[in-house]
Curated annotation (Swiss-Prot):
It is found in: Secreted, Extracellular space, Extracellular matrix. Residues 309-393 form the Ig-like C2-type domain. This is Cartilage intermediate layer protein 1. The keyword Secreted applies. It comes from Mus musculus (Mouse). Disulfide bonds join C161-C195, C165-C200, C177-C185, C330-C376. The lineage of its organism: Eukaryota, Metazoa, Chordata, Craniata, Vertebrata. Residues 1138-1184 are annotated as: Disordered. Keywords: Cleavage on pair of basic residues, Disulfide bond, Extracellular matrix, Glycoprotein, Immunoglobulin domain, Secreted, Signal.
Length: 1184
């Protein structure tokens, strides 16, 4: 007996020790709920407290009116705040966050004390959404606990016993500490106790129909027969599919035969039994047994292609103070849908049992050690995918969220404003780096913060800059703080043209998924406003006339706002050929004349079938278009971004050996046909890198995600072409059903990043970097024996430049520097930027890369050997930096794992450069604003653009009669607003463009500050505009319609000086009949580009790159030739060296100003004016 007691005691000690050990472990991982801050008693009492006995809760706001509406439901409030709400509230009160009662808003709302409050966007007036509401509840007296009782939540129910039936186990319960002070939370958050599970019993399964089977997990009906027919997405049969019965454990019942049919006896048609049907590469089918009294039943089902999970919502960057709460959200789709989410903090997996595999990660009572990088991994039976990495910043209670000291930011001054103090034409006005900061947040825990806070300028000082003969006012940033981010909108514009001759795709459709979102115009142009929640922009361009192959593109865009321009190149669809469905057909895949095909398609006889699965025996009209990577001019037509997702959820690149698009149709009815058992024969001699041969795979494109998915492997097979020649082919099998674009690709893991920056001029100043430039890289394969001459291209990528340049992914090799080489190009709004020259001058300081690493990279601009070739690209060898080499550790090539170092590299680090050809114009704003970055907008009465989401550009056309081109200036000042009258908004300079046909006539399209509301939207200001030609000029005439308008819209500006023209700018968008051109857009560059094109054309709806001097003119000046020795504004600027006060920056040579428009006969420079030819490649031009 004593021995038994000793054993029982030891067992209890062991079990209690286990419980305490689990308690300690779990207590360390439990997150505390954010404490609810006390509400002052004056706010806690309602106005009608004498008429409403009871006590009011605090105000709750757990939702915002995004999505379907605003939901302040009682059950959700209880979930977050527990016992802060009583069990049975008596009343409910709702107000907007602006403190307006819900009944006074005029909106349709719903509410009850037992259910809470809600407002639906679809029930409101058109164009109006619900306001953001906050609610509180009136509770019976004494039903709300005091603050002292809010240290701990109530215990949760006991968990189930951990032991199997008939055994002893442990069950636990938990509670949460609600206190703001950690010292009050010293007690246990989890406790456990021993438990005895239920005694094991006989089978307790009851069957409403049939009998229980021997395993006691299903009901069986011996006289019932289930028939099934399973088909593939294209209508064909699905042989070999497994049929499972879902019981306590899935049981395989049978497989489908060659015709996709199956029979299963003994199941019960009870309307409850569930079958699961699976087949490799397809999403499982779940079927509930039909309920019937018959002896048999037939089910039909069609597989849906399995799709790897795809991230549609990435966690957002957020900032919080210690003690606050935050939620990070991740969402993925797929077939089947992902059922598990894993969260990682600084690459360490967070405890899945704590966060329940949920897509929303909630962290309460944050501590500073929880700051860092977070990402999620979504998982399903079809695979896994990882989200983008986001940054969570956690600062101390007393820490400043932003650095109050602005960083240096140089602006360029006018030509007559040289500063002796800095010995340059630049002035430091300062700026605040725009980054997410920990600002004021409400109590709601949301995926997207209700208010996004950024560091921005909070205080400026007005300073005066001394220039030659006048003073120039400016506003300098002196303090930064955390404030609401400027509202922005992301826009993608572009032009869709053919790869071969530049023919536009007219009136084609643009799809995002299954939704048509835009349409191309007559010139192939399109504009798309990107939805706010878009993570990856995948667009499919469909030609209604079927001239071009449908093309899917993944287009980079700026999530922080502004417009990005893309040139979309499409392959012309091959002329169809006629095939006999009852014969074996061979179709070659190759487009290079004089070269063997890369591969062949072999379509055996009787392989074609209709969409319903019926075999097709007639004539087939077949169009197979092959994108041949041996022709470098086709690189820009590559579809998607050539990426796939591996089994671990990581995105990996592919190196292509050719893409082909297929279109099979019934010659008689044009009905689309499918083809099964198609073979692809890849000529192994076309694969120049031996290590790629065993890794070759066949892929198809998912048009919804823009990702490539594996179709199958290749195997070796020898074939004899003729009596003497025998070749080795890689043979792969495929079926052509719902997907029509295929790829011969190799996964490639040898990756690096190239650092590229783009500048406004050859001065290469950090403050003159351009954002929103599309930088593209073409990966090349070397020709055997000639490392400098490319054999074929293998991959095409594009990246958008940000405030710190861009990092382009490219293949690289650390053993052989010549294994890979690349071409790099850059364009802005369709205009190609120039690369730094490599011949006849080779200046490492100008290129941006020091020696000896630059020699190893073999930098060559495209005109290196032929000066007639365009200067808009450069080629380098992708030599991976050696880890122990100091000269290779600071860029411009970074190892793939060093992406963060590439993105955060300072301007002094090595990088490659592109620059704009300096045009003959100059802009100065009193309140500095970077047009590439709409988030740099500052609230100020003197802001040139008064509204951050509505940029209005105004131009006036000025005609100059005289032998020389003249610099024309607009000086823009406040005219009628009491806050700005007499104060300078800014100045604009532009040089007139000579007319092609009239030697003594030139014209200028001059920007001026539009009249209208200022930033406070209180009252309008008629801008006082002075148009001043810089020379010996006098006003000859004023457009009569413009003059009449100004006379009829007083006040009228005084014009006593005939050498200039003064007006109070019109409020109305007048048009070409007045010589005024006005365009409003959500992107400033787009507005200016469109308005400038109309001004050049002299119309209100057209566009031109050639100046038409005699149409749409507002002002005419007669200008005499300048005296000998007197310099123009731009000549003065050319003759003065541009020196920067910035230190630590690699400076290039200072070029002479290029007068592009004058030298090209009035042309506005665009990217398509001259062909770009690559060294050693005798193919068609890359840019058409």
């Amino acid at each position: 007996m004593a021995a038994i007691k000793t054993w029982v005691f030891s067992f209890l000690v062991l079990e209690v020790t286990t419980v305490l050990g689990r308690q300690t472990m779990l207590a360390q991982s439990v997150r505390r709920v954010q404490p609810v801050k006390r509400t002052p008693k004056t706010l806690a009492k309602p106005a009608d407290s004498q008429e409403s006995p009871g006590e009011w809760t605090t105000w709750f706001n757990i939702d915002h009116p995004g999505g379907q509406g605003d939901y302040e439901r009682l059950d959700a409030i209880r979930f977050y705040y527990g016992e802060r709400v009583c069990a049975r509230p008596l009343r409910l009160e709702a107000r907007t966050t602006d403190w307006m009662p819900a009944g006074s808003t005029g909106q349709v709302v719903h509410g009850s004390p037992r259910e809470g409050f809600w407002c639906l966007n679809r029930e409101q007036r058109p164009g109006q959404n619900c306001s953001n509401y906050t609610v509180r509840f009136l509770c019976p007296p004494g039903s709300l606990r005091g603050d002292a009782e809010h240290i701990w939540s109530s215990w949760s129910p006991w968990s189930k016993c951990s032991a199997a039936c008939g055994h002893t186990g442990v069950q636990t319960r938990t509670r949460t500490c609600l206190a703001q002070t950690v010292s009050l939370c010293s007690e246990a958050t989890e406790e456990g106790q021993l438990c005895m599970s239920q005694a094991c019993t006989a089978c307790d399964l009851t069957c409403p129909m049939g009998q229980v089977n021997a395993d006691c997990d299903a009901c069986m009906c011996q006289d019932f027969m289930l028939h099934g027919a399973i088909s593939l997405p294209g209508g064909g049969p699905a042989p070999g599919a497994a049929v499972y019965l879902l019981a306590k454990a899935p049981k395989m019942l049978t497989r489908t035969d060659s015709s996709g049919r199956f029979r299963v006896p003994g199941l019960c048609p009870d309307g409850k039994t569930i079958l699961k049907i699976t087949k490799t590469k397809f999403a499982p089918i779940m079927i509930t047994m039909p309920k019937t009294s018959l002896k048999s039943a037939t089910i039909n089902a069609e597989f849906v292609r399995a799709e790897t999970p795809y991230i549609v919502m990435n966690p957002e960057m957020k900032a919080r103070r210690a003690g606050q709460s935050v939620s990070l959200c991740c969402k993925a789709t797929g077939k089947p849908s992902p059922d598990k989410y894993f969260w990682y903090h600084n690459n360490t997996l967070l405890d899945p049992s704590l966060y329940k595999h949920e897509s929303k990660l909630v962290l309460r009572n944050l501590q500073q050690d929880q700051a860092g990088e977070y990402f999620c991994k979504a998982q399903s039976d079809a695979g896994a995918v990882k989200s983008k990495v986001t940054q969570l910043t956690v600062i101390a209670h007393d820490e400043t969220p932003c650095n109050p000291t602005p960083e240096s930011y140089l602006i360029r001054l006018p030509h007559d404003c040289f500063q002796n103090a800095s010995n340059s034409f630049y002035y430091d006005v300062g700026r605040c780096p725009i980054k997410t900061c920990a600002g004021q947040q409400d109590n709601g825990i949301r995926c997207r913060d209700a208010v996004e806070n950024c560091c921005g300028i909070s205080r400026t000082e007005e300073r005066e800059i001394q220039c030659s003969g006048y003073t120039l006012p400016t506003k300098v940033a002196v303090e930064c703080s955390c404030q609401r981010c400027a509202e922005t909108r992301s826009i993608v514009r572009g032009r869709v043209t053919a790869t071969d001759n530049g023919e536009p795709m007219r009136f084609g459709h643009v799809y995002m998924g299954n939704n048509r979102v835009s349409m191309t115009g007559y010139k192939g142009t399109f504009t798309l406003h990107i939805p706010q929640d878009t993570e990856r922009l995948v667009l499919t361009f469909v030609d209604r006339l079927q001239k071009f192959v449908n093309t899917t593109k993944v287009l980079p865009f700026n999530k922080k706002g502004s417009a990005v321009f893309h040139e979309i190149k499409m392959l012309r669809q091959k002329e169809p050929i006629t095939l006999e469905a009852m014969e074996t057909n061979i179709i070659p895949l190759g487009e290079v004349i004089g070269e063997d095909p890369v591969a062949e398609l072999e379509i055996p006889s009787k392989s074609f079938y209709r969409q319903n699965g019926e075999p097709f025996t007639g004539k087939v009209k077949a169009s197979v278009t092959f994108l041949d990577p041996r022709n470098i001019s086709t690189a820009t037509a590559a579809q998607s971004d050539l990426n796939f997702i591996n089994d671990e959820g990581d995105t990996f690149p592919l190196r292509t050996y050719g893409m082909f698009s297929v279109d099979f149709r019934d010659e008689a009815t044009s009905e689309s046909l499918n083809a099964g058992k198609v073979k692809v024969h890849l000529d192994s001699t076309q694969v120049k890198m031996p290590e790629h041969v065993p890794a070759m795979k066949l892929w198809s494109l998912n048009p919804d995600t823009g990702l490539w998915e594996e179709e199958g492997d290749f195997k070796f097979e020898s074939q004899r072409r003729n009596k003497r020649e025998e070749r080795t082919f890689l043979v792969g099998n495929m079926e052509i059903r719902e997907r029509r674009l295929f790829n011969l690709d190799v996964p490639e893991s040898r990756r690096c990043f190239i650092k590229v920056r783009t500048y406004r001029s050859e001065r290469f100043l950090p403050s003159e970097q351009i954002q929103g430039v599309v930088v593209s890289v073409i990966n090349l394969e070397p020709r055997t024996g000639f490392s400098s001459n490319p054999r074929a291209w293998g991959r095409f990528d594009s990246v958008i430049t940000g405030p710190n340049g861009a990092c382009l992914p490219a293949f690289c090799d650390d053993q052989s520097p010549d294994a890979y080489s690349v071409y790099v190009l850059a364009s802005l709004s369709g205009e190609e930027l120039e690369a730094v020259e490599s011949s006849p001058k080779f200046n490492p300081n100008a290129i941006g890369v020091p020696q000896p690493y630059l020699n190893k990279l073999k930098y060559r601009r495209t005109d290196h050997e032929d000066p007639r070739v365009k200067k808009t690209a450069f080629q380098i060898s992708m030599a991976k930096p050696r880890p122990n080499s100091a000269e290779e550790s600071n860029g411009p090539i970074y190892a793939f794992e060093n992406l963060r170092a590439c993105e955060e590299a300072p301007p002094s680090a090595a990088h490659f450069r592109f620059y704009q050809i300096e045009g003959d114009r100059y802009d100065y704003n009193t309140v500095p604003f970077n047009e590439d970055d709409p988030m740099s907008w500052t609230e100020d009465y003197l802001a040139w653009w008064p509204k951050p989401m509505e940029f209005r550009a105004c131009y006036i056309k000025v005609k100059i009669v005289g032998p020389l081109e003249v610099n024309v200036r607009s000086r823009n000042m406040g005219g009628t607003h009491r806050q700005t009258v007499g104060k300078l908004y800014g100045i604009r300079d532009v040089k007139s463009t000579r007319d092609r046909d009239q030697p003594n006539v030139s014209s200028a399209c001059l920007e001026f500050k539009c009249s209208g509301m200022l930033y406070d939207q209180d009252r309008v200001d008629r801008t006082l505009v002075k148009v001043i030609p810089q020379g010996s000029c006098h006003r000859a005439s004023v457009n009569s319609m413009l003059h009449e308008y100004l006379v009829n819209h007083l006040p009228l500006a005084v014009n006593n000086d005939t050498s200039e023209y003064t007006m109070l700018a019109p409020l109305d968008p007048l048009g070409h009949n007045y010589g005024i051109y006005t365009v409003t857009d959500q992107d400033p560059r787009t507005a200016k580009e469109i308005a400038l094109g109309r001004c050049f054309d002299g119309t209100s709806d057209g566009s031109s790159r050639i100046m038409k001097s005699n149409v749409g003119v507002a002002l005419t000046f007669n200008c005499a030739e300048r005296q000998v020795g007197r310099q123009s504004a731009f000549q003065y600027l050319q003759s003065t060296p541009a020196r920067s006060p910035a230190t630590g920056t690699v400076q290039g040579r200072v070029p002479a100003m290029r007068q592009q428009r004058a030298s090209r006969g009035g042309l506005r420079r665009r990217g398509s004016m001259a062909p770009l030819r690559f060294s050693g490649v005798a193919q068609q031009p890359l840019s058409n």
